[in-house]
Swiss-Prot record:
Residues 757-915 form the Integrase catalytic domain. During replicative cycle of retroviruses, the reverse-transcribed viral DNA is integrated into the host chromosome by the viral integrase enzyme. RNase H activity is associated with the reverse transcriptase. The gene is pol. It comes from Feline endogenous virus ECE1. Specific enzymatic cleavages in vivo yield mature proteins. Residues 491-637 form the RNase H type-1 domain. This is Pol polyprotein. Belongs to the retroviral Pol polyprotein family.
Length: 1046
């Protein structure tokens, strides 16, 4: 303290870096000031941090300010004392400032650069290190906080003038600044090693004298540069010191008792978050725990938030085992990067374990204990391949300690031969390339001879050690789930079957089916639930073929690579890795894969053979595969259908029919005669089918063809059967077919009604955008306004269809000239339904009516005017040769405003009470023209108005008072889908009708109103077998009723 007073915080006061410029904090481009009020603070806490705030104000570290930024101050109580320290919550500020790449050293490998020969140490901890760096004035207001101190007259905001604690970039900024200031010391004193971790310094020297000299020069350098060390925490020239939680002595390192005690006092976790905290704290010490990954394996399953948290005995055992391993943690040697390393590796049950060592005389001294859990893919490999994955993982981890020094790898397996010649059935090319690039680095990594017993294999393991073996021979003999499973056909097979699964989209629904055939007959076929994938269908078909071949010799062909690989290779891999993917998630089609693996052992002998799909040849394999594909597609359309019969044996005419009395009466009515031999009713050589069989036949034929009523009736007439009242049954079946209802054309015809109009000019307008081609000077559209009373039209060229343009023309053109509209009608275009347009209407009190979607007739007046304007512009363009159609728009509007309607009146005459003064354009003005008497002119206008308004009254006669369509609330309807593409259905539904108007309906599930012409009634019953009526029963309880089928 006396020799270097400027280097110590106790004698030199607060430090300030003399060679560092003020730091400027960069904000993100979109950052805005954030202001968070101060949290409530107890009186004890306020009084506890008040001395610190007062001291910082006196030292100039804090200053008063007024800033739009504000973050709260948190008082944190120091453990074991009654003292508080102020901590600022800068999380919101951190979100709004630019990130910089962190260059702070990694404490995991920082000591790897320290030579074990330097056994004298000095440890210095800089006091208030961040406050040594000044903060630029323009950046100081970012860190403002509220503070009140009535005794000093302070009530407002304070901010820091130095780099604050809690700021995310403070460690990196200070670490870089201190490195720059100590560069000269490192170059001038090579006899010592100086390690720096932010504000913690470690100086190591080979002798006590060198350590003392280096410490003096370091203290002088710190004092001259403006830094201050804490004398209370200093450890000067000692052979045993504590640094970064480690005890260093004689080239070795231990865990400090404080760190071990911290882990030992952690209570059992109560939730996944506490499990992760424990594993993180204990994981910092994993270098000292042999087999850490194996001990902690049961706890990793509890770290997932999605899984239920259940603390069991195995978890408690793993929890206590980790604590016990820490209490007996050994001493590890410091890595000497001037000497080579040896890594002993072993793998058991998916856990890689290793011991990194260096020679110390005749002994191998441990430097680190490494352990890691293999990923689910590697865990499913044979042991001779798992060791390759384990070696790659541990070599990568050891590189943090070896820092590129030569490394010798020793395992119980012939690892180098495995890496160079790996069976491709187990490992992908990408993963193999990664392993080879990592392990076949001959300049750095060498492989020692396989050793069955090494320090890694002697680590605690739950099973006995393996005996010596030949890895390549073991891999060659490793097979799939069943050892005798072949991929070539058996010459003595009892049968050869072909399997296939089909999955495709039909009417918006994914349908699927599976089949097993022998090339001539259907062995088994079944429709699968909607949404079943093609891969799942293939697995189901192959599994069923194996089950039906129980106890037999079978050749089974499949064109699915997925099913073939699952049976031969992947199934065994899935079984080894616990049916998990490489990401640790459950595999798809898990149940089907398990069923397939079980069914593989049912046949006495089996060969699963892959064949190309969709071949056109006539050989048995191509024919059988095509038949399997066709049958699978056919059964996919059925709701629930399972076929196990042979096609040739199906003969409908041999069945005996049961005729009910009603069926017999109908047969007699059409003149049929009972055949005494077959007991069938026949007419003209055709069998009269009973109603039940006839209905089933019609349903099946319609399911195959989906023909209309007339065509289906003609098709039935060509069969050997006669169906009484066939038209009624066909109508019943086709009307209940949901597929036909969704696809067939046809809608409800709605007669034209009366369009709502204004009762005087300027009251009711219809507006619309229409595109005009070719575009000119960026103008693409016309915004058209039509007065529904007079037919008067206004049109304005625009570049875009925007709500801003609609509002602008209403306020600047329509309102000043014609008055405030009461009603505006339009389609559902974005410019009309936007908040701008609708907000303007609400503000002005305008009733904005949106017409039915995809119903241009609802806006018929303005739609017809669009056509008129564009046709007129086309003609004028051809006559004049002008390309700028905007210059011709006024002439087109003149024509539209003076075209007579069906009553012989023009919009101009209706609006102004007379024809336009076109005739005066040809006559010159004469001063001798008599002046018009005003009174006579007004009387003439009155007469003209009476003459004009009489025919206009015809437009306002009430229309048909009844609803023009048959829909009622509660009915089921199909709604036309206007956006159907490709093979999608034209109609969606059915939907329930909720509300009705004379021209539109509102249905459940669709927000917009639907015009009645865009809907059609759905069948009242889903099928002919469903009862048609329900009966209502009262009960004694007035709030309870009972429904029953009739």
């Amino acid at each position: 303290l006396q020799d270097f007073p400027q280097a110590w915080a106790e004698t030199g006061g607060l430090g300030r870096a003399k060679c560092q410029v003020p730091i400027i904090i960069d904000l993100k481009p979109t950052a805005m000031p954030v202001s968070i009020r101060q949290y409530p603070m107890s009186k004890e806490a306020h009084m506890g941090i008040q001395p610190h705030i007062t001291r910082f104000l006196e030292l100039g570290v804090l200053r008063p300010c007024r800033s739009p930024w504000n973050t709260p101050l948190l008082p944190v109580k120091k453990p074991g004392t009654r003292d508080y320290r102020p901590v600022q919550d800068l999380r919101e500020v951190n979100k709004r400032t630019m990130d910089i790449h962190p260059t702070v050293p990694n404490p995991y490998n920082l000591l790897s650069t320290l030579s074990p020969d330097r056994t004298w140490y000095t440890v210095l901890d800089l006091k208030d290190a961040f406050f040594c760096l000044p903060l630029a004035p323009q950046s100081q207001e970012l860190f403002a906080f509220e503070w009140r101190d009535p005794e000093r007259g302070i009530s407002g905001q304070l901010t820091w003038t130095r780099l604050p604690q809690g700021f995310k970039n403070s460690p990196t900024l200070f670490d870089e600044a201190l490195h720059r200031d100590l560069t000269d010391f490192r170059t001038q004193h090579p006899e010592v090693t100086l390690l720096q971790y932010v504000d913690d310094l470690l100086l190591a020297a080979p002798t006590k004298e060198a350590c003392i000299r280096g410490t003096k020069h370091l203290l002088r350098e710190l004092g001259d540069k403006g830094y201050r060390a804490s004398a209370k925490k200093a450890q000067i020239c000692q052979t045993k010191v504590t640094y970064l939680g480690y005890i260093l002595s004689e080239g070795k390192r231990w865990l400090t008792p404080g760190r071990i005690e911290t882990v030992a006092h952690i209570p059992p976790p109560q939730n996944p978050r506490e499990v992760r905290e424990f594993l993180g704290t204990a994981g910092f010490c994993r270098l000292w725990i042999p087999g850490f990954a194996e001990l902690a394996a049961p706890l990793y399953a509890l770290t997932k938030e999605s899984a239920p948290f259940t603390w069991q005995e195995k978890h408690q055992s793993a929890f206590e085992a980790l604590k016990e391993a820490l209490l007996s943690a050994p001493a590890l040697g410091l890595p000497d990067t001037s000497k080579p390393f040896t890594l002993f590796i072993d793998e058991k049950q998916g856990i890689a374990k290793g011991v990194l060592t260096q020679k110390l005389g005749p002994w191998k001294r441990p430097v680190a204990y490494l352990s890691k859990k293999l990923d689910p893919v590697a865990a499913g490999w044979p042991p001779c391949l798992r060791i390759m994955a384990a070696t790659a993982m541990l070599v990568k981890d050891s590189a943090k300690l070896t820092l590129g020094q030569p490394l010798t790898v020793i395992t119980p397996h012939a690892l180098e031969a495995i890496v160079r010649q790996t069976p491709d059935r187990w490992i992908t090319n990408a993963r193999l390339t990664h392993y080879q690039a990592l392990l076949l680095d001959t300049d750095r990594i060498q492989f020692g001879p396989p050793v069955t017993l090494n320090p890694a294999t002697l680590l605690p393991a739950p099973e006995d050690q393996q005996s010596a073996h030949d890895c390549r021979q073991v891999l060659a003999e490793t097979h799939g789930t069943r050892e005798d499973l072949k991929d070539q056909e058996l010459p003595d097979a009892d049968h050869s079957w072909y399997t296939d699964g089909s999955s495709y989209i039909d009417s918006g629904t994914r349908r699927a089916g599976a089949a097993v055939v022998d090339g001539h007959h259907i062995i088994w076929a079944q429709s699968l639930p909607p949404g079943t994938s093609a891969q799942k269908a293939e697995l189901i078909a192959l599994t069923k073929a194996l089950e039906l071949s129980e106890g037999k010799k079978a050749n089974i062909y499949t064109d699915s690579r997925y099913a073939f690989a699952t049976a031969h290779t992947h199934g065994s891999i899935y079984e080894r890795r616990g049916l998990l993917t490489s990401e640790g998630k459950e595999i798809k089609n898990k149940a089907e894969i398990i069923a397939l693996l079980k069914a593989l052992f049912l046949p006495r002998k089996v060969a699963i053979i892959h064949c190309p799909g969709h071949q056109k040849g006539q050989d048995p394999i191509a024919t059988g595969n095509r038949q399997a594909d066709q049958v699978a597609r056919q059964v996919a359309v059925a709701e629930t259908l399972t076929l196990t019969t042979k096609l040739e044996e199906t003969n409908l005419t041999t069945n005996k029919y049961a005729y009910t009395p009603e069926d017999q009466e109908e047969a007699k009515a059409i003149g049929a005669i009972l055949n005494q031999d077959t007991k069938d009713w026949e007419k003209e050589g055709k069998i009269v089918l009973p109603r039940k069989e006839a209905l089933a036949m019609i349903q099946q034929m319609h399911a195959w063809t989906h023909l209309s009523n007339q065509k289906l009736k003609l098709l039935i007439e060509k069969t050997d059967f006669l169906i009484p009242k066939a038209g009624t049954l066909i109508e019943q079946v086709t009307s209940a077919c949901k597929v036909c209802q969704q696809v067939n054309a046809g809608a409800t015809r709605v007669p034209e009604g009366k369009r709502t109009r204004g009762n005087r000019p300027g009251v009711y307008w219809e507006i619309d955008f229409t595109e005009v081609k070719p575009h000119y000077a960026g103008y693409k559209y016309l915004l058209v306004f039509v007065d529904t009373f007079s037919g008067w039209v206004e049109a304005y060229p625009t570049r875009q269809e925007t709500a801003h343009m609609v509002a602008k023309k209403i306020l600047e053109e329509i309102f000043p000239r014609f008055g405030l509209p009461k009603v505006i009608g339009s389609d559902n275009g974005p410019a009309f339904v936007s908040q701008v347009s609708q907000g303007l209407a609400r503000t002005l009190g305008i009733n904005w009516k949106l017409h039915c979607a995809y119903r241009p007739q609802s806006s018929g007046q303005v739609e017809r005017m669009n056509r008129t304007i564009k046709e007129t512009l086309t003609k004028l363009t051809l006559e004049t040769g002008l390309k700028d159609w905007r210059r011709l728009l006024s002439l087109a509007l003149l024509r539209a405003r003076n075209t007579p309607n069906r009553f012989g009146l023009t919009p101009y005459e209706i609006l102004y009470g007379g024809p336009p003064p076109l005739s005066t354009l040809l006559n010159s003005f004469s001063p001798s023209d008599p002046k018009t008497d005003l009174q006579a002119r007004l009387k003439g206008l009155q007469a003209v108005q009476a003459q004009i308004w009489t025919p206009l009254a015809e437009l306002y006669r009430p229309g048909h008072p009844q609803t023009s369509y048959p829909f009622q609330v509660g009915d089921s309807v199909y709604v036309r889908w206007h956006r159907s593409q490709g093979l999608e259905p034209r109609w969606k539904g059915p939907y329930i009708v909720l509300l009705t108007t004379p021209t539109a309906i509102k249905v459940d599930g669709i927000a917009a109103w639907i015009h009645a012409s865009h809907a059609k009634a759905a069948p009242k019953t889903p099928g002919p077998e469903t009862p048609k009526t329900w009966k209502l029963h009262r009960s004694e309880n007035p709030l309870k009723i009972r429904l029953s089928r009739v």
